Amino acid sequence: MFVIKRNGYKENVMFDKITSRIRKLCYGLNTDHIDPIKIAMKVIQGIYNGVTTVELDTLAAEIAATCTTQHPDYAILAARIAISNLHKETKKLFSEVMEDLFNYVNPKNGKHSPIISSITMDIVNKYKDKLNSVIIYERDFSYNYFGFKTLEKSYLLKINNKIVERPQHMLMRVAVGIHQWDIDSAIETYNLLSEKWFTHASPTLFNAGTTRHQMSSCFLLNMIDDSIEGIYDTLKRCALISKMAGGIGLSISNIRASGSYISGTNGISNGIIPMLRVYNNTARYIDQGGNKRPGVMAIYLEPWHSDIMAFLDLKKNTGNDEHRTRDLFIALWIPDLFMKRVKDDGEWSLMCPDECPGLDNVWGDEFERLYTLYERERRYKCIIKARVVWKAIIESQIETGTPFILYKDACNKKSNQQNLGTIKCSNLCTEIIQYADANEVAVCNLASVALNMFVIDGRFDFLKLKDVVKVIVRNLNKIIDINYYPIPEAEISNKRHRPIGIGVQGLADAFILLNYPFDSLEAQDLNKKIFETIYYGALEASCKLAEKEGPYDTYVGSYASNGILQYDLWNVVPSDLWNWEPLKDKIRTYGLRNSLLVAPMPTASTAQILGNNESVEPYTSNIYTRRVLSGEFQVVNPHLLRVLTERKLWNDEIKNRIMVDGGSIQNTNLPEDIKRVYKTIWEIPQKTIIKMAADRGAFIDQSQSMNIHIADPSYSKLTSMHFYGWSLGLKTGMYYLRTKPASAPIQFTLDKDKIKPQVVCDSEICTSCSG
């Protein structure tokens, strides 16, 4: 039996050679648990005549990955095999890879079709010796197997469908794409990215340095006008943004309701549902980022709109397809008055914006005055109990996980962009709160800090966190200036207001590394101090940039220009970790370069790349299933697996018990200290999660993607959570509602072959916000 080598030559299969290759990659791993011969034997079983060495490496990596539940070092070995394979298939020098990408010729038409931009190529040519010399390829081997596979699938650039970039090449491309001729800053950014201190958002990783360097994640639009022209002009904007890999939030509260008169045609409106069907089909038609993910939009509506009940049914699995838009996400922009009426079991008037104009343009007391005026003038379409609408909201959430909920008054009251006008919607992932109008499309550029990295020698390094945040602020400001904007209205907005969004990933990992239970007082205190540090560092860096380049155009009249920062709007006094008053004085003197700074986003894909838990979330399970080409296998929380292995507590019985219990360790006989630290989201009081969101909210000047997890949701449970979040002043009340399946098959045995652990969804619904 023979294999085909990379050079095309045939060679007889040699077991010892396969074993030797695997053994070479086991350096530094626990040899008591890692068995190269076992891996090699399984590889031999999968061999066929004419198999390539590339295919052998791929198989060996997958086999090693399937052994991860035996020892965490198998995951490292799997990644090393896969990355070593890539290194053998790609050029080493960064400059040569960039040349290949620039010199690409389309094989179908013979035309020069560069993948990277001419300016990127010019910079690389000028500084190639320096750039080539600072890249450290060993850092590629720090990715775990699934992080690397995520990069391989969507992030590393290809020529004729063959990957040509290594992870380090990608990171240097991103750094050079952002900083261009400022080569020292590019190298600083490269090192921080490759050491995993932070990551830029997916669109930045996809597109930095390329010919279409669209690096922004989020776009927020208002419907231009309640007319055919306005609706279709807005649709075109959405299509152009979606084409360039942007996630969209769209407010439609100004579109007239069904049954309303249309004076131009002397007809009757069909309302928002047929219009949204058109938007739904546009989202389906456009594949963002060259099939890296499908087009996605979140549609925002205020609950006084008389089409609200039909809107709440849009994503349901049953019902007439003519009244469904299952490819759009639905979201509510809820005024406080509605919550008060629900709380008091009051009546609620449903209105048409054509007959009751201006409700979407006002908030707070002004909204209440206008709304109650329209009620007194009997301009409403109908009156129903507020709780009827509320019940429909809860039912939709239990069935579909949506609508997302944001509180209009909190979003406007606590926004540093309040001086611009009324904010009417958020984005696709509910963490961006920015002003938009008919002439401006709000944009946000994102990055996320890997909090686990800052746990050094058993303590959290706040000073290092602040320093990294300051680099991120400088980077995101450069992105604003050099970005390719899909539409001019987005460029106008972004350069006037200069908002950015700094988020986090690995909060749960940081707590685990410090041995803090997620719901402990220590974790709750650290949660506040982390976000206080991020906000402080971001303000400090933005003020420094303003000193050099001037404040953003619309700074005058903002809260910050009057010495009011986010925590002041929450009536919170910061800790004594940082000295706030001198910073406020500096801001009064020089201003800020950015209107907004902090926005914890979901980090779905980038957290997987870096091997961290997502965003600010606790772990949802301690064991889950991954799907690969060779089949399915189980992955255990790596922190748990390591501690159990070190304490000689890991065995098949424990593994099977965790699988039977859906990823929980609470029913095992493990020590109590381990049980406390490794609680899943389902075992942590949801009100603690919401309280921690409010605690950090005082230092988040945008908002945060906050999911609500209720294993078995009911009207009363979900209502209680929503009203608790609203009462604490949250801007985002809920991103998704996450639930457990209604029933699970009865487990009659602990036989691992008969146990179905939680399957991780590999959907990339919100890659655009994965910072």
Swiss-Prot record:
Superkingdom classification of source: Viruses
Binding site residues for dTTP: D226, S227, I228, K243, R256
Known EC number: 1.17.4.1
Cofactor(s) listed in the protein's UniProt record: Mg(2+)
Cofactor note: Maximal ribonucleotide reductase activity requires the presence of Mg(2+) ions.
Active site, per annotation: N427, C429, E431
UniProt keyword terms in alphabetical order: Allosteric enzyme, ATP-binding, Deoxyribonucleotide synthesis, Early protein, Magnesium, Nucleotide-binding, Oxidoreductase
ATP-cone domain location: 1-92
GO MF assignments: ATP binding; ribonucleoside-diphosphate reductase activity, thioredoxin disulfide as acceptor
InterPro entries: ATP-cone_dom, NrdE_NrdA_C, RNR_lg_C, RNR_lsu_N, RNR_R1-su_N, Rrm1
Annotated residues for binding of ATP: K5, R6, E11, N12, V13, M14, F15, D16, K17, T53, D57, K88
Annotated positions binding GDP: S202, S217, N427, E431, T603, A604, S605, T606
Catalytic activity field: a 2'-deoxyribonucleoside 5'-diphosphate + [thioredoxin]-disulfide + H2O = a ribonucleoside 5'-diphosphate + [thioredoxin]-dithiol
Similarity annotation: Belongs to the ribonucleoside diphosphate reductase large chain family.
Complexes and interactors: Interacts with RNR2/OPG047 subunit.
Purpose of the protein: Ribonucleoside-diphosphate reductase holoenzyme provides the precursors necessary for viral DNA synthesis. Allows virus growth in non-dividing cells. Catalyzes the biosynthesis of deoxyribonucleotides from the corresponding ribonucleotides.
Designated name of the protein: Ribonucleoside-diphosphate reductase large subunit
Species this protein is from: Monkeypox virus
